[in-house]
Amino acid sequence: GLPGYFGVN
């Protein structure tokens, strides 16, 4: 998600 926060794209 967005720049890849929390290890999720």
UniProtKB/Swiss-Prot annotation:
<keyword id="KW-0963">Cytoplasm</keyword>
<keyword id="KW-0808">Transferase</keyword>
<dbReference type="GO" id="GO:0005737">
    <property type="term" value="C:cytoplasm"/>
</dbReference>
<dbReference type="GO" id="GO:0047849">
    <property type="term" value="F:dextransucrase activity"/>
</dbReference>
<comment type="function">
    <text>Involved in the production of dextran, an extracellular glucan polymer.</text>
</comment>
<comment type="similarity">
    <text>Belongs to the glycosyl hydrolase 70 family.</text>
</comment>
<protein>
    <recommendedName>
        <fullName>Dextransucrase</fullName>
        <ecNumber>2.4.1.5</ecNumber>
    </recommendedName>
</protein>
<keyword id="KW-0328">Glycosyltransferase</keyword>
